[in-house]
Amino acid sequence: MENMEDIKPTTLERIHSAAKREFLEKGFLGASLRNIVKTAGVTTGAFYGYYDSKEKLFDALVSEQYEHIMDMYVSTQNSFKELEAEKQQANMGKIGGDCLEQMIDYMYANEDEFRLILMCSKGTRYENM
């Protein structure tokens, strides 16, 4: 049985870890691909074996969480639209509040990714979220 200390992160895991730190510290625009690969201990060529741009790397770090929270919102919105008008009026506050609470819980459970989206994404497709 392998000891936890014997398990080494994969190249992709090292790239993701280094990129997350770099983006959180400097934002997307200030982040250096050179620093990311150096911190990850890989070559630029190895990086380009996985991603063809810094933006694709950023997207890989946050797209799952972004899509999930948008799906939560759209699903709640669609369910609300299916209610009869009087039920919409009677339940608007509760439905909206419940959705917001679930979204905030999800954001806290994925704090680094949402810090990237909300505070470090200038220059990416997420900057106006």
Where in this protein do the model-derived segments appear?
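Short hydrophobic/aromatic patch on the recognition helix
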Residues: 42-51
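Alpha-helical structural segments
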Residues: 10, 14-21, 25, 35, ...
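N-terminal intrinsically disordered/low-complexity leader segments
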Residues: 1-8
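Alpha-helical transmembrane segments and their helix-entry boundary regions
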Residues: 31, 56-60, 116, 124
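Short coil/turn segments at alpha/beta junctions that flank glycine-rich nucleotide-binding fingerprints
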Residues: 26-29, 110
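Flexible coil/turn residues that form the inter-helical turn or adjacent wing/linker of helix-turn-helix
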Residues: 29-30, 50
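Short secondary-structure transition hinges
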Residues: 83-129
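Short, flexible helix-adjacent loops and helix caps
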Residues: 2, 27-28, 78-81, 85, ...
